Every structure is written in C-alpha cells, then in structure tokens.
C-alpha cells in the first residue's frame, strides 16, 4: 500500500495559512502565495527589529540635541562635557529627562558647560 502525506501536508498548510490570516486576497487563502507572503513578512519583521534600535537612538539624540540647544549647548559638546564630568547616563534616560524633567536636564547642561570651559 502506498503511503501518502495528506494529513501532514494539510497540517503544514494550515500552519502557514494561519500565519497569513488577515492578508489581502489570495495571499490569505492560497497556500503557495500565503507561504511566500509570510516568509517575506517574517523577513521584514526581522529587519525591522534591528532598524528599531537605530531609529530610537536617532530619536533620542534628536531630542537631547534640541533640549541642549535650548540651554545654549550643542549635542556633541553636551555629551563631551558629561563624559569629562564622569556622568554616565545613557541617551534613552537623557532624552526622557529632556522631556519630562527639564530642570534636572538644565542642571546637567550647566555641569557640562563647567567641564568644557574649565
């Protein structure tokens, strides 16, 4: 008797079609197109997880730069002054301070200015 792969093939197809749920047109119903669409979306998701880190760092730097310039210092000089002062806060925390705690951020800018000017 010839053994076929019907049950397992159907399970495999259902798995991919389940991942393609919500896709438009045949991409959610036809296995071959659904499989291609899901593979592409997984690839974009993988790439996106790496781009997200870059995008957030860029956003934090932009926010820090804007807040530092309001207090009379450029971003690069501000970071240099903090390094010289021995203050090691990451950019995520600095950006949060720039938005939510402007007084504390202004104090950090003053500390950085003192370190730069000597």
UniProtKB/Swiss-Prot annotation:
GO molecular function: rRNA binding; structural constituent of ribosome
InterPro entries reported for this sequence: Ribosomal_bL20, RIBOSOMAL_L20_CS, Ribosomal_protein_bL20_C
Keywords for this protein: Ribonucleoprotein, Ribosomal protein, RNA-binding, rRNA-binding
GO biological process, any: translation
A UniProt-annotated Pfam family: Ribosomal_L20
Gene3D superfamilies: 6.10.160.10, Ribosomal protein L20
Single GO cellular component term: ribosome
Listed SUPFAM superfamilies: Ribosomal protein L20 (SSF74731)
Function: Binds directly to 23S ribosomal RNA and is necessary for the in vitro assembly process of the 50S ribosomal subunit. It is not involved in the protein synthesizing functions of that subunit.
Family: Belongs to the bacterial ribosomal protein bL20 family.
Protein name according to UniProt: Large ribosomal subunit protein bL20
Annotated source species: Caldicellulosiruptor saccharolyticus (strain ATCC 43494 / DSM 8903 / Tp8T 6331)
């Amino acid at each position: 008797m010839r053994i076929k792969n019907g049950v397992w093939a159907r399970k495999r197809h259902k798995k991919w079609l389940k991942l393609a749920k919500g896709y438009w047109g045949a991409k959610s119903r036809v296995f071959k197109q659904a499989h291609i669409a899901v593979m592409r979306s997984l690839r974009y998701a993988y790439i996106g997880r790496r781009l997200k880190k870059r995008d957030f760092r860029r956003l934090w730097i932009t926010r820090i730069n804007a807040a530092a310039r309001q207090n009379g210092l450029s971003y690069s000089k501000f970071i240099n002054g903090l390094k010289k002062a021995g203050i090691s806060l990451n950019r995520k925390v600095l950006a949060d301070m720039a938005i939510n705690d402007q007084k504390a951020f202004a104090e950090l800018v003053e500390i950085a200015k003192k370190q730069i000017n000597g």
